[in-house]
């Protein structure tokens, strides 16, 4: 083995050695040219006064980086690793740019610590939970990533049955699987950037609760760690975490006094709204159209967006015989945005249409109010680029993030923005907008460096088998 071999310890020659020959007394031992002893038979002994063992009195304190010092490192490193892991978990749910949202998350964490646990929602095809505060009031909806419709720990059996009985129709090949929680947060981000204010604030959050659907291994490990902490505290304190591991998912603020849109739309059909109130509904509806079209929501029916219809009465006049009724207020909340941001337009079995396109509100051309709000933004390339970068920062948090798939998602979104911009400029209606041929706008590849990006536009010719479903 030569001196440059990687198997030679760097500390091999740090201690001086003397060579005592067994051939004849007083014989000198030849040295190699580099000052080391040649390979003659004999006994190697330490020169008196050198370190004899790690931690001995004669050796004194070990210098940093020496083998004796390295022997003391693992325990310290493990404790530092545990502390770093605990600190990382505490910093998972930090939102310095949104203190109001951070306060709601903190309330949820305190409630879970007091065993006021999230409650699983019976509706839907995935594991989603009502999150409560310490008073037991619902404050948010949490959707873990691994309990999504196609997640490994989805507690609902409907998707498993669909996969078993009809595998050809299982999943949506236009979507990135198990990315619904990012889609929920991404829809909220787009809503904020465009000042639509119809999506309840949604962000990526880490939570742990006994009511979540965990694997048997995780539950056994959690019980074992708790038992070790109770019986042998010194051993239990070595664990990075005591309890179930936190789950990553979307955390959406719960909105009160809202009902399914289908309920109110039927009421409004039987009992038409006053002109001013109907105008409010139309303006709110157009915001929903803008959001759904840009993110290409593939799951927008009339049962997963909400309407709040508030008819306040004047409390001052309620004491009299006459009751003054104030003008009603209508607001829309766009929830269930987990099946958006496709990497291609639907072209297989189903078209996944926007069901609001069959409503009478969709036949009215876009108002000047929505044009003034949206057109200056989506017509600005810098704004669109900034939106893409914000979505990139959000989506790259996923462990399975794929840059190529993200580029395809952005290409679809650019095409949607292009169609929406042109439809608003041409004075079209939402119904005419969804009838526009789908477009994909990709970044053009160039071998020459340039300060500006160029794009290529392409139309999708292939149509899904069921164009109405």
Curated annotation (Swiss-Prot):
GO terms under biological process: endosome organization; Golgi organization; phosphatidylinositol biosynthetic process; phosphatidylinositol phosphate biosynthetic process
Class in the EC hierarchy, top level: transferase
Residues spanning the signal sequence: none
Topology in membrane: Lipid-anchor
UniProt KW keywords: ATP-binding, Cell membrane, Cell projection, Cytoplasmic vesicle, Endosome, Golgi apparatus, Kinase, Lipid metabolism, Lipoprotein, Membrane, Mitochondrion, Nucleotide-binding, Palmitate, Phosphoprotein, Synapse, Synaptosome, Transferase
Region annotation Catalytic loop: where it falls in the sequence: 296-304
Subcellular location field: Golgi apparatus, trans-Golgi network membrane; Membrane raft; Endosome; Endosome membrane
One Pfam family here: PI3_PI4_kinase
Lipidation (S-palmitoyl cysteine): 165-166, 168-169
Similarity field: Belongs to the PI3/PI4-kinase family. Type II PI4K subfamily.
Official protein name in the record: Phosphatidylinositol 4-kinase type 2-alpha
